[in-house]
Amino acid sequence: MKKILLTLALVAAAQFTFAQEKTDDAKQPASELMTQLRLASDLARYGYETYSASALIEAARILNGVPTYELTPESFIKGEGTADGKAQKTEFSVEQLLKDARAYADGNVTLLALADQVKIDNGTSRGRVGGAAVHEDCVYANCTDNYTIRFIAGEEAEVAVVGDGDTDLDLYIYDSNGNLIEKDDDYTDTCYCSWTPKWTGAFTIKIKNRGGVCNYY
């Protein structure tokens, strides 16, 4: 099963001339791994918005238990634009979350002790087997970022996008023939799509920014 936050799957492609079947409107629930990643991201965002040390510590604890690796797309085409001086979103890593949690704790010994209980993973247990590919980037105002990723036939594929809250982001999944097979185009910047590929091959993931400023996801 391949997952991405942005989460995607990779393997060798086969050539087909017919369209990947579009998934049914009834959405399948997200996997436990993807649910944990999205929960951690939501907690981190809340923690930074409210200066909550406890929320950041819990986000770090969840992330520390989820195997992840950096997404390596087959190709990546970034929409043309600029960040217009907007400050970059804080990295949601275990180390950064705990560092900021300790600062927000303001000497509270209970919170500092909770932060110390979260064991920082040095990376030895975070491999590709059973993990999720993750990537952080910025989609410029009124632009679209395009990722090409290979997914495995018969294995559930999942893609989630969590923005910084400033604009509406939409997520679209296309097969190798350009057919739209899945989308999440609500009015938020939190998106999720899942499908089961009929064949092993390349899929295009498009992240569209509907707003007038860049959005860090």
Where do the PLM segments sit?
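Alpha-helical, heptad-rich or low-complexity scaffold/stalk segments
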Residues: Q20-D100
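Acidic, Ser/Thr/Pro-rich low-complexity intrinsically disordered segments
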Residues: T50, G130, V134-Y216
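Sec/Tat signal peptide C-region and signal peptidase I cleavage site
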Residues: Q15-A19
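Sec-dependent N-terminal signal peptides
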Residues: I4-A13
